[in-house]
Amino acid sequence: IGVFCLLCPVIAANGPAIIGSLAMVLLAAYICYVVHAVVVYSLTVGTLGGVSPLKFFKGMLPAIMFAFSSASSVGTLPINLECTEKLGAKREIASFVLPLGATINMDGTAIYQGVCAIFIASCYGIHLTLSQMLTIVLTATLASIGTAGVPGAGMVMLAMVLTSVGLPVDGIALVAGVDRIFDMGRTTVNI
């Protein structure tokens, strides 16, 4: 009901066609989340960790499912710690690295901010220059490092990304109604 209420003013102002656009931007974000997780994490755990990517994802499945349903990186820490220990990580190392990663390893948030900034620019008919796109990449990366690991924090930092390239902050209203759906995917990548 809450998401429906948030979407009503957006649909009233932009027409029902915005629903298809929101579905497409959600699809784009989730494709980016999956590609990032599969490519980056598989290469990292395979190359640096010496663990089979399949074994890694299977071992992390409880944490992945909890992160997806809770949308909280910090809330997932106990399960994440348990999963990493079962995969062979030493408790001393995992208990240091995981809380640090829950704060500064927000790749999903950076992806979300980049996708949403481009979507908002498109909705407003603003054509971004290469310089503006690079600024989005830089500010999204910096914002993701400083984002709290709690539900909805990425949307707050999106305002900074939009401001950095002169996009209207009002555009956040376009994605606010479906932010929870974005948040589930980005948190899964963040853990």
List each model region and its residues:
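Transmembrane alpha-helix boundary and packing residues in multipass membrane permease domains
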Residues: G2-P9, Y41-V45, E82, G114-I118, ...
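Transmembrane helix-loop junctions in multi-pass membrane proteins
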Residues: L6-S21, C123-H127
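Entry/N-cap segments of selected transmembrane alpha helices
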Residues: P16-Y41
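Membrane-interfacial loop-to-helix junctions in multi-pass transporters
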Residues: I31-Y33, G46-F56, L87-A94, G125-T135, ...
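Alpha-helical transmembrane segments of multipass membrane proteins
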Residues: C32, H36, V40, N105-G108, ...
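Hydrophobic, small-residue-rich transmembrane alpha-helices and their short perimembrane loops
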Residues: F56-T76, T103, D170-R186
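Helix-loop-helix junctions within the multi-pass membrane cores of secondary transporters/permeases
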Residues: P62-S144
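Transmembrane alpha-helical segments and their short flanking loops
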Residues: G114-I191
